[in-house]
A protein has these predicted regions:
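Glycine-rich phosphate/cofactor-binding loops in nucleotide/flavin-utilizing enzymes
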Residues: 361-426
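Glycine-rich flavin
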Residues: 50-58, 63-164, 169
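A short core secondary-structure module
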Residues: 167-203
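Amphipathic, small/basic residue-rich leader segments at the start of a protein or domain
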Residues: 1-99, 424-425
Length: 426
């Protein structure tokens, strides 16, 4: 039974997204609706959303941030993250699958040189970027096992890359892979942007998490794969607010997961005909206690949306700071973006996981049936919340509040150092 128009949540354009947000969003909302229709089935059958991602990209979703003059939509960061939140409400796997793409778009927007226009054209043409950064196992903290080696014969012949990465989210859908590596000739840590469609590049859809099952994460292996010289980029030149940006995509996933749970369970309550003898009304849809549960979850979705929007505004200021020519102000804005997203993460990690669990209080035993798959909302939210543990972010926020300590903007994960050796930094 479809949701009556009078009961659908209005798509309110939040202040930070601008008055023209709905004009932008209307292009994608019919597609979001189709994506939502198949989300539960895809999750249950572990069907990767290849067609859905391709349809989004063909509709211009991947070029949202590209300036209008270059063929994109010229969306602001608040607009982008509002759209990602709406997409997450349809299927939270898709924003995470495209997280690396939008981060690389952002990096190219603040970059200089001829490569910037070349990449903008690729984004407009519908090319997708994935990522391969994390290495599992005994790789020491701060080390990089994936190596980039210059081809023999001069500086213009390019490089080869060899290594194995896990958590390669989105790479299975991608044309290019944003890969964290280290050069063998000078030891510099780099981003190697690897063409995904070549010999020596393989992907395995072996991510076995209980949530976010169809993000296309898993293992990427590079065996002497070619990298063009212009696509070996010093890591130190990456956009400064990258960690905050990556986190903000997960915030959108959390916010969208609450909305998705609210919508589905509200419809379940609306359609339910059985009641309890000790309830309060002749239908679940009229029972004030059941309505209270749905209302509280709806309020959580509202708070989550507002939190994401606030973090996105801080990111927009950080983006604009890159062009001010004022290094001190640029640093201040980047620190602010990191702190804003950290605070948002601390709040939403708890808010989302509790809300998508509490929503079951509006159901009965039938609500936990596997065919309904309502539990996927909790599994998805819990999985997104477990990325980048919030407990460390809370300490960082507190250290800044008490001691004025700047937040770290780049961090790594790996095997603990031996003895009293301090952890290295990127």
């Amino acid at each position: 039974m479809p949701v009556p128009a009078s009961l659908q949540r209005p798509a309110v354009a939040v202040t930070g997204a601008g008055a023209d947000y709905d004009l932008l969003a209307v292009r994608f909302r019919p597609l979001f609706a189709r994506i939502a229709e198949g989300a539960s089935r895809r999750e249950q059958e572990h069907e990767l959303p290849r067609a859905e991602i391709r349809e989004l990209i063909d509709a211009g979703f991947g070029a949202l941030r590209v300036p209008v003059a270059d063929g994109g939509s010229g969306a602001s960061l608040p607009q982008l993250f509002r759209l990602l939140t709406e997409l997450a409400a349809a299927d939270p796997n898709l924003p995470q699958a495209l997280r690396a793409h939008f981060a690389f778009v952002e990096d190219r927007l603040v970059s200089t040189g001829p490569q910037r226009s070349r990449w903008r054209a690729r984004f407009v043409d519908g090319e997708i970027v994935g990522s391969s950064w994390t290495e599992v196992g005994a790789v020491p903290l701060g080390d990089v096992g994936t190596k980039v080696t210059r081809h023999a014969g001069g500086t213009d012949t390019g490089f080869s890359i060899t290594g194995t990465k896990y958590y390669s989210t989105g790479s299975i859908f991608a044309d290019w892979i944003d890969t964290f590596a280290q050069r063998t000739d000078n030891g510099v840590k780099v981003i190697a942007v690897v063409n995904a469609h070549q010999p020596g590049v393989t992907h395995r859809d072996d991510w076995d998490g209980f949530g976010q099952r169809t993000t296309g994460s898993g293992t990427s292996t590079f065996e002497q794969a070619h990298v063009d010289p212009e696509n070996v980029i010093d890591f130190d030149t990456r956009f400064k607010y990258q960690t905050a940006f990556y986190q903000a995509v997960l915030l959108a996933v959390l916010a969208g997961s609450i909305t998705a749970a609210e919508r589905e369970v509200a419809q379940e309550v609306r359609n339910r005909t059985r009641i309890f003898s000790h309830g309060n009304a002749s239908s679940f849809a009229a029972d004030p206690q059941i309505l209270q549960v749905i209302g509280q979850v709806s309020a959580a979705a509202y708070a989550a949306d507002a939190t994401v929007e606030r973090a996105a505004r801080a990111l927009q200021l950080a983006h604009e700071g890159a062009f001010l020519g004022d290094d001190d102000e640029d640093e201040r804005r980047n620190d602010a973006a990191e702190l804003e997203t950290a605070k948002a993460q601390v709040i939403l990690s708890s808010l989302a996981t509790h809300a998508v669990s509490d929503v079951f209080d509006a159901l009965a035993a039938s609500g936990v049936g596997r065919s309904k798959n309502f539990d996927r909302h909790w599994r998805n939210a819990r999985t997104a919340a477990n990325h980048n543990p919030w407990v460390f972010k809370a300490r960082i926020v507190g250290d800044h509040s008490v001691n004025g300590t700047p937040p770290p903007r780049v961090w790594s994960i790996g095997a603990a150092p031996v003895g009293n050796t301090p952890p290295p930094r990127l």
